[in-house]
């Protein structure tokens, strides 16, 4: 998956509230460049489902994946503790790109290769 396609799909996943709708809408999309008579790759549905899940992880989900306390997570990733607390309680929102980076850095999401 190219970086450009990944960014397109991530943005689309953020905009769609229902996982199944996202997967069905994008699994047969022309963005993949499949030949008209080609079979869909077996892993595409799983890839799209995992990407949607990652787009909808909260910062708390990501932190809890690590098993770290708020203070330890904030220290490890150089995030002001108050900022992390605000994100977790919904007083402020963590930018989507930062949630994605943290999900990848912590292993909560592994981006597909290729």
Identify what each model region corresponds to.
Residues 59, 80, 103-107:
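Secretory-pathway ectodomains
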Residues 58-72, 101:
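Short basic helix-loop element that most often maps to the first helix and adjoining turn
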Residues 1-53, 111-113:
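N-terminal flexible/basic segments that precede or flank functional cores
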